[in-house]
Amino acid sequence: LLAQSDCESLSIRELLALEPGAQEDFLDTWLGYSENDGAPALREAVSGLYAQCGPENVLLHVGAQEAIFGALNVLVEPGEHVICQFPTYQSLYEVARAAGCELSLWPLHQGEDGWYCDLDELERLITSKTRLLVLNTPNNPTGYALSADERQRICELARRHGLRILADEVYRGLEAPDAVPPAFCDIYERAFSVGVLSKAYGLPGLRVGWIASQERDAIGALSRYKNYLSICCPTPSEALARIALKHGPAVLARNREIIARNRRIAADFFARYDHVFLHNPPQAGPIAFHGLRPDFVARFGSALAFCEHLAQSAGVLLLPGNVYDMDAPYVRMGYGRANFAENLAVLDGWLQQNG
């Protein structure tokens, strides 16, 4: 597997070992219903990730997917206009479309030095019906990360036009420790930040996500909507999530080290196969969206056909760009797993024979 979007995971035993006495405490976890908004202690821990959002500004969810689904059904009405960054996690625009919203996609562009965004292009997409701007940074699948200046300019644009912002920030924390940008919910009073333990922390089995905003009334509306979804998070997951967040800096540091090591390995690989790939190293996070050179992809007909052939002939899985509704020949590669070098070596061997 070379297509993963998350980071190296931990076992329950490894997670409990981070906290003395945690195993006995975990075995005493009550298996009744949790609170609809989430366990107070866990909401307190999540709020510690933000500067302007206390526990009352945080709503826990079963994963980020539920938070996205709720937000796009509560924050906008059918017929209103939503602008979504593209390419991105499909739910961020497909749920808006399914909810009856008009949709415009704000594309990232391929440049000589990787991906970039055009803020003037974003402003041209805004209409009198626009109500919500949906962002994903660091971005899945490109690894593009909005700069601090771009974030401020987007917030100023949203404020000027009276827009809300829904920011999928599930990879936040994988930037360099001295360069982690403020969350959108901290720098814009009408922004909603989505987080999760699945991606940056590498704990998707816990199924714990959240949404945070300074708009407490909207958080209340999202809480009421959640009553028709999961109702509450599993109490064992909440107990383990508290440990993960308490030791979050160590978990994130480990994952950043894995990504950095794999980036160095990948840089050498792509230098040797420049005739096959357009190398787009991730600016932040564990995933990148690499291009396929025209002469190479022409041998297969499409990125999808190449990925299918690669999976069947070499047992290597890359994710083709058509999964993200991209016609251009791109493949997603994940840098977050400890066995990256081993898996990349299999692709290397195949390319030596077929590249």
Regions found by a protein language model. Name each.
Residues L1, R242, I258-A267, H279-D295, ...:
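Conserved glycine-rich beta-strand-loop-beta hairpin in the small C-terminal domain of fold type I
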Residues V74-A96:
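Conserved PLP-anchoring active-site segment centered on the Schiff-base-forming lysine
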Residues E80, C101, R160-L163, E189:
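A short helix->loop->beta-strand "cap" motif at the edges of active sites that frequently abuts
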Residues A99, R160-H161, Y273, A314, ...:
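Helix C-cap/helix->beta junction micro-motif
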Residues Q110-A179:
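Active-site phosphate-binding strand-loop segment of PLP-dependent enzymes
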Residues E189-A260, R264-F269, N354:
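Conserved core segment of the aminotransferase class I/II
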